[in-house]
Every structure is written in structure tokens, then in C-alpha cells.
């Protein structure tokens, strides 16, 4: 017999419940240490490498290849548009976190979301 996993908004409901229960039993599970290494290239251009992090009481090694992100400035700020500027990258992170949290909370409450745009 095949078992199907119930998902809402792309999240498995059993995983949501398991995560909540794990945090309630051991609040240290919720502590995360995120890391980034940034290297200046030239002018306003720099590059960040993101790979490992500590979370859920363990070191995460699931990323075999690091994420590489470029930051730069627009020409008006003496850059070459080789990437979003650092303030834009920060905004991307904030709205991404807000959007994911909202959709996850909706899923945890059984609410299906069909579309979201955050600004």
C-alpha cells in the first residue's frame, strides 16, 4: 500500500508538526548560526560564498557546492551592475523570509495559498 504525504503550499504537514514538537521539547533546536564569507573583487563588486551552517543542534553539510552571490553597485554609485547592491540583497532576504514564513504559517493552519507577492 502506498502512503501519500499531505502537503499544503509545498510544505509537508508532518514535517511542520515534527519541527514544532522538536522545538517545544528542546528549544535549542531553534538556534541557528548562519555563515557567509565575502571577498572584495574590485570597485563596488564583491562576492559572497554561502555553504555550511549550524542548526537543529548539528552542523549542516547538505550543500556540496556553495551558493555564490555577487554584489555590486549601479553606475550612478560607481559600480557595474554585476549584482544587486548590498541593500537590495538585504531587502531580498527580508521579503523572502517574510513570504516563506507567511506561507508556512498558512500551511500549518491548513490554509492553501495560491499566490503571494511581497514588497
Regions found by a protein language model. Give the residues of each.
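Alpha-helical metal-binding/catalytic segments enriched in His/Glu/Asp
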Residues: 94-98
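Aromatic- and glycine-enriched beta-alpha-beta binding-site module
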Residues: 99, 103
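Extended beta-strand/beta-hairpin segments
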Residues: 1-92, 104-119
Amino acid at each position: 500500500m502506498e502512503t501519500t504525504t499531505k502537503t499544503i503550499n509545498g510544505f509537508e504537514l508532518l514535517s511542520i508538526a515534527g519541527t514544532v514538537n522538536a522545538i517545544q521539547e528542546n528549544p535549542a533546536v531553534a538556534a541557528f548560526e548562519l555563515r557567509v564569507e565575502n571577498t572584495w573583487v574590485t570597485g563596488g563588486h564583491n562576492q559572497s560564498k554561502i555553504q555550511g551552517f549550524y542548526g537543529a543542534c548539528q552542523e549542516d553539510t547538505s550543500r556540496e557546492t556553495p551558493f555564490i552571490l555577487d554584489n555590486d553597485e549601479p553606475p550612478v554609485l560607481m559600480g557595474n551592475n554585476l549584482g544587486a547592491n548590498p541593500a537590495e540583497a538585504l531587502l531580498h532576504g527580508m521579503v523572502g523570509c517574510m513570504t516563506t514564513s507567511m506561507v508556512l504559517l498558512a500551511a500549518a493552519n491548513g490554509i492553501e495559498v495560491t499566490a503571494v507577492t511581497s514588497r
